[in-house]
């Protein structure tokens, strides 16, 4: 696993959580409007359990990633990796916040991802 793949784990789980939340919300709405809401109850319960599991997994992955990021010596790399992979900000958002060019952000991301690769 590369450093970038390791760091992307949290983003992927976050996307799964959002997807399950959307499914759960739509299923709940259908159950409210439908006279056969008991039919949907098992599916709603399954989605709630899946959401709980994903949130637990997300917390564990986030902790592992943050532990590795904290091992990097360069402060800017740490900040940029945290903003990109934990706060899930775009390169443009990070560049604006840190008063840096997008190329500078990409440079630090690449350096940080390489450093993470050596730590995993």
Regions found by a protein language model. Name each.
Residues 5, 89, 104-107:
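Short, well-structured alpha-helical interface segments that form or flank functional binding sites
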Residues 66-70, 82, 106:
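Solvent-exposed, non-membrane alpha-helical residues enriched in polar/charged side chains
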Residues 73-87:
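Short amphipathic alpha helix immediately N-terminal
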């Amino acid at each position: 696993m590369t450093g970038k793949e390791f760091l992307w784990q949290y983003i992927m789980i976050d996307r799964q959580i959002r997807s399950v939340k959307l499914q759960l919300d739509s299923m709940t709405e259908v159950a409210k409007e439908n006279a056969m809401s008991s039919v949907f109850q098992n599916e709603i319960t399954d989605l709630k359990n899946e959401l709980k599991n994903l949130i637990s997994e997300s917390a564990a992955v986030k902790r592992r990633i943050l532990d590795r990021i904290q091992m990097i010596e360069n402060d800017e790399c740490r900040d940029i990796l945290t903003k990109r992979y934990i706060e899930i900000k775009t390169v443009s958002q990070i560049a604006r916040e840190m008063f840096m060019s997008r190329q500078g952000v990409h440079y630090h991301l690449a350096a940080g991802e390489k450093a993470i690769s050596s730590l995993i």
